[in-house]
């Protein structure tokens, strides 16, 4: 996104640290897993392309906050400051990523109400800053109990409010994860629901 659209990205990761995110980004550029990158390392003939990839990624304008559990007010405040700073530099904030929604701090009488408020607050951030927000979410364990493992809207963990607040809900499904003998290896299917 950052490279294609020439816009900056703010990532709020409450589960992974910056180093792990960077490892995954670098590994994806080489078509390997971050585990392979750590275990096998970089072969001699890949050192130069590896260093070029690191330089390229570091210049893309990807800002990562890995402080842990943040409130939506803290996310909004950070994004507002970043957007102002980028505007002074003649740059633009083009995307906000929250990984993941259920780890945001919130107060409510039930967990379902907390998550509903977080989803609404993230929607409000997108609207007030005029920047799309991608909020990652966990699925409930119920999907594992079904024969058909393809995700559905009802599988969003803890609340239907996530789908109510979202403009688009997209799921990733890999058939090979559940069916070892599949003829659809290394293909991902995206299930998309557009909500208004």
Q: What do the predicted segments below correspond to?
A:
Residues 4-92, 106:
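Cytosolic-facing regulatory segments adjacent to core modules
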Residues 4-9, 59, 93, 98-101, ...:
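Active-site lining segments that contact anionic ligands and/or coordinate catalytic metals
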Residues 17-21, 42-50, 71-75, 97, ...:
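Helical mechanochemical/support elements of P-loop NTPase systems and associated helical scaffolds
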